[in-house]
């Protein structure tokens, strides 16, 4: 497989929309939504922290230096963007709580502010968040492009958007996935096991994005061409599907087609299950009740069946499925932005956008779907 970045297909067919977005603390904000309410009792202090110009790991090092707490004792649910104003929840042993207020000025000097203090029985673990609320400000936006942007947002509100991994997974030079494959091939290895695991997960992410783009291509072909033309296309690709099945696929109301053998998942969380009645599952997909999923290949992965598996096989890798430390999983192919708000400020030529996404989903995927930038090979942040 070619490991160079290729343009990922968009869900919708509008022309590119020209505007400027700068990933900065002024124009990009991320607010973490916790998975559960904190009990206000327990051995772990839980603080809500606001940061700017810092990665989450840099923030943890600052807390370690100022408070004397070991980094391993700090809990966090996920990594937040460096080039943004972000809030997230951090847990630390209760004994360090009295030091927080005493070091307010020290935190402020490092672009950190503790917004609230609570307590809980458990340490916060990776993945212990519901999702994130985002704010983005687009600049140099004309009234016509603002109107186009609102039309795209209406489509996204109705049908959702592709759940692509963002560029954070692939590094500054878009090569993390290549290093991950080299680790699997025993061509390279780093001293820190967490770095090795992250790079391998970048390779998983690259394969997922490629599979999702391929599925979008197939969905568009099914929608845009006749049954006869589709039969010829699938025949050329050595994919087995008959005319009756193609007619049923064309009749699915959602632009992303659910195929025979797809693995579905209840949305926004729940169990995986096989898509047995495609018409029924397509209706549930349209109602945002269940979503088709894509493969994150690895040990004990759950694979698709039938036609979906025939397509998925191209994006499997035996080195992932046999690697003892790399567990396989599945990820939503599609997600739905919620609580979408927008405002166009004509005199400033600015467009302000707010929305919520479930955990693991990237604001850059929504930006990509709006902007449709020509010649893009990855996201802007």
Curated annotation (Swiss-Prot):
The active site is at residue 81. Keywords: Isomerase, tRNA processing. Pfam families: TruD. It catalyses: uridine(13) in tRNA = pseudouridine(13) in tRNA. GO terms for biological process: tRNA pseudouridine synthesis. Residues 160-335 form the TRUD domain. One of its GO terms (molecular function) is RNA binding. Responsible for synthesis of pseudouridine from uracil-13 in transfer RNAs. Belongs to the pseudouridine synthase TruD family. This is tRNA pseudouridine synthase D. It comes from Helicobacter pylori (strain G27).
């Amino acid at each position: 497989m070619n490991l160079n970045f290729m343009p990922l297909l968009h869900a919708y067919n509008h022309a590119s929309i020209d505007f400027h977005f700068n990933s900065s603390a002024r124009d990009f904000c991320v607010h973490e939504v916790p998975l559960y309410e904190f009990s206000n009792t327990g051995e772990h202090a839980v603080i809500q922290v606001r940061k700017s110009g810092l990665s989450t790991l840099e923030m943890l090092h600052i807390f370690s230096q100022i408070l004397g707490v070991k980094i391993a004792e700090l809990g966090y649910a996920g990594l937040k963007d460096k080039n943004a104003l972000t809030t997230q929840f951090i847990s630390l042993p209760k004994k360090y709580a009295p030091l927080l207020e005493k070091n307010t000025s020290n935190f402020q000097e490092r672009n950190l502010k503790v917004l609230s203090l609570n307590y809980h029985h458990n340490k916060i673990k990776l993945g212990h968040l519901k999702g994130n609320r985002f704010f983005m400000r687009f600049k140099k936006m004309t009234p016509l492009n603002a109107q186009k942007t609102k039309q795209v947002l209406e489509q996204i509100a109705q049908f959702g958007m592709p759940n692509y991994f963002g560029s954070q997974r692939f590094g500054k030079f878009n090569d993390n996935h290549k290093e991950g494959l080299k680790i699997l091939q025993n061509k390279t290895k780093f001293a820190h096991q967490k770095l090795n695991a992250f790079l391998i997960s970048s390779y998983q992410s690259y394969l997922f994005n490629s599979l999702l783009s391929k599925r979008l291509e197939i969905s568009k072909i099914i929608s845009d061409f006749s049954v006869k033309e589709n039969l010829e296309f699938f025949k050329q690709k050595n994919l087995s599907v008959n005319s009756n099945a193609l007619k049923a696929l064309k009749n699915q109301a959602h632009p992303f087609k659910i195929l025979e053998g797809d693995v579905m998942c209840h949305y926004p969380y729940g169990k995986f299950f096989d898509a047995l009645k495609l018409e029924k599952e397509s209706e549930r997909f349209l109602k945002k009740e269940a979503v088709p999923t894509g493969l994150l290949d690895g040990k004990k992965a759950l694979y698709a069946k039938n036609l979906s598996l025939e397509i998925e096989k191209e994006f499997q890798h035996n080195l992932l499925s046999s690697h003892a430390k790399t567990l396989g999983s599945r990820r939503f192919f599609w997600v739905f932005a919620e609580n979408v708000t927008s405002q166009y400020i004509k005199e400033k030529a600015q467009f302000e956008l707010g929305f919520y996404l479930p955990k693991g989903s990237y604001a850059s995927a929504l930006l990509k779907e709006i902007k449709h930038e020509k010649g893009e090979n990855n996201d802007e942040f």
